[in-house]
């Protein structure tokens, strides 16, 4: 059987490891990630207004970058739409 001081040290070590794990998990959950959203207001029919796209994306998130791109990987096919890329929280809400 272990001595009481050894048991206390073992229990303390376990709690310290658990506390560090919880802190790391909370920190990683708050780390910014890149989000993407197609903004329909800048895309009208077969055209996309690049200035309006950039401005709407900046309104969504201060560091957002808006570009007009086609929905498909082949630029000659498909209609252009406003793609907004921005930093967001883990729940998808943008950083302001």
Curated annotation (Swiss-Prot):
InterPro entries: DEFL (IPR010851), Scorpion_toxin-like (IPR003614). SMART domains: Knot1. This is Defensin-like protein 151. Its main location: secreted. Belongs to the DEFL family. Keywords: Antimicrobial, Disulfide bond, Fungicide, Plant defense, Secreted, Signal. It comes from the Eukaryota. One of its GO terms (cellular component) is extracellular region. The keyword Signal applies. It is found in: Secreted. One of its GO terms (biological process) is defense response to fungus. Residues 1-29 form the signal peptide. It holds the Pfam family SLR1-BP. Disulfide bonds join 35-88, 48-68, 53-82, 57-84. The keyword Cell cycle does not apply.
């Amino acid at each position: 059987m272990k001595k009481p001081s050894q048991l206390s040290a073992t229990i303390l070590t376990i709690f310290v490891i658990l506390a560090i794990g919880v802190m790391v998990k909370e920190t990683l959950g708050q780390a910014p990630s890149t989000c993407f959203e197609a903004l329909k207001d800048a895309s009208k029919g077969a055209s996309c207004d690049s200035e309006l796209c950039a401005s709407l994306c900046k309104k969504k998130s201060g560091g957002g970058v808006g570009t007009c791109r086609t929905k498909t990987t082949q630029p000659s096919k498909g209609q252009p739409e406003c793609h907004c890329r921005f930093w967001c929280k883990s729940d998808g809400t943008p950083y302001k």
